[in-house]
Amino acid sequence: MKQLKPNSKYLLFGQALSFMGDYCVLPALLILSTYYHDYWVTSGVIAVRSIPMVFQPFLGVLVDRLDRVKIMLWTDVIRGVIFLGLTFLPKGEYPLLFLALLFVSYGSGVFFNPARLAVMSSLEADIKNINTLFAKATTISIIVGAAAGGLFLLGGSVELAVAFNGVTYLVSAFFISRIKLQYVPIQSENVREAFQSFKEGLKEIKTNAFVLNAMFTMITMALLWGVVYSYFPIVSRFLGDGEIGNFILTFCIGFGGFIGAALVSKWGFNNNKGLMYFTVLSIVSLALFLFTPIFAVSVIAAILFFIAMEYGEVLAKVKVQENAANQIQGRIFSVAEASIGLCIAVGSMLINIVDAAVIMAFIVLLVSGLFLHTKLVNKSFSERNNESEQIHL
């Protein structure tokens, strides 16, 4: 940390606080949505949070033409003001206004990540350090944010958690305003070329079995994430009034992810052992989460689920990085980002359409299909490695 330059420190501090607020407010928003007594509003919270991701791949065109630091600054200011404004909205009233404000906030937020990545690329020697520190800060921020939200709820009201998120955005904006980088506009590709890049990413996914499997993994996990998020308020009811349960379950995201990241090297890549762990954990943890009436069991199930999801996420990214040309990887991940946002939204809507048994049956079929496809791809990977070794001999 001491070796980081001032610009890197400001970016890291701002993002750590902002991420902490994000996971403090997520359960708070799910709690507020239950006051509308309509699960479509709960699903709507998840949908407006994820749908803007669909447009993120095409925003690089604008980001390259504007001052990236100012984009980050004003994005955080807008988000901070909106979340502070949400605290004045009466509970259970004006559902469309509630969702519209969230959509504007998360919609503006999709400009932030491309700008942040572009700023990080300007940090020169600090790039590796800040990426490593940011990865570590992510899981810690989730845990601290969820814990802070729980304390706010116990100490006063759920609105405090929402206000806390607004404050973290404004503090993040303060740190970002101190970043001193010379603005150099870049004449990047136009919108038509951006769509062409997107199509090239789709083509690579269709023709490369390894990349297709990575994509299959990512959209499957996104659907599962949407389902789990939508059930947070229901599962939380098994713990007293249920409100604090949302924060405990959000804590599980960070805790499970932390364990999952640590297990990646032990479970391995492109082997059937890791695949079996991922498949069994995904199905068993979701079954427990959806059907058990015991909150303690739900917490254990949530931790196991997020362990599996962290492992799957790392596996999918590495599969793309190892099996696709470097110049095409950005386009593949652009398609992935758009698909993930859409699939999280779809997964969150299932609770309003079919019951838990049908959702579980669908998940079993989907994960089983992923298991079979991955096993075939792993076999191809093993055969390819054996052929490569024989050539070198």
From Swiss-Prot:
SUPFAM superfamilies on file: MFS general substrate transporter
Principal localisation: membrane
A molecular function GO annotation: transmembrane transporter activity
Membrane topology: Multi-pass membrane protein
GO cellular component terms, semicolon-separated: plasma membrane
Regions that span the bilayer: 11-31, 43-63, 69-89, 92-112, 133-155, 160-177, 215-235, 244-264, 287-307, 353-373
One Pfam match: MFS_1
Subcellular location: Cell membrane
Coiled coil regions, renumbered to chain: none
Keywords: Cell membrane, Membrane, Transmembrane, Transmembrane helix, Transport
General function of this protein: Part of the bacilysin biosynthesis operon. May be involved in self-resistance to bacilysin by permitting efflux of this antibiotic.
Similarity comment: family membership: Belongs to the major facilitator superfamily.
Protein name: Putative bacilysin exporter BacE
